[in-house]
Amino acid sequence: MAAFPPPHRILFEPLNDRSSHVEWTMYVAANKHRCDFEEIDAAAMNSIDDFAPWVTQWMSFVPSQAHIRIRVLMVWHAHFLTAACQQMLRRSLEQRSFRCRLWFHIEEPTLQPAIVSRCIATRMPDYRNVPDVRGELNTLLWTDPHACEKGMANSEHV
């Protein structure tokens, strides 16, 4: 993951973003002296009216310091982007990708194939959360939901 300059990347992590966040944080920390980094959450800004002007403006900015030549934008939850936004990003990857690199975090594989073909895709390690169960675990809810609900209703009347 120590590649520099950073290629366009897709960080695919099904139903989570913990490993992607760790990877992004480590890369930013290791390269903040030679890259400008920015993040945007596509879950909050995903329409063509909001997202496209913001990305176009970001690509037109100059780096923060004279010795910095590469700028990297992390698009969190890119699977929420509309088809029009993805089309705009695809065109941007074709035309202006020398100094402005895009990283995508996706939880569902719904990016356009034209974007995926221009990026290095990485499947992030799964985050496993093993719950710590204390006390008795009643599995009746899964094995016989009707009886469980009936038992809960009966206990409310008592």
Model-derived segments and spans:
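P-loop/Walker A NTP-binding region and its immediately flanking N-terminal helices
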Residues: M1-V158
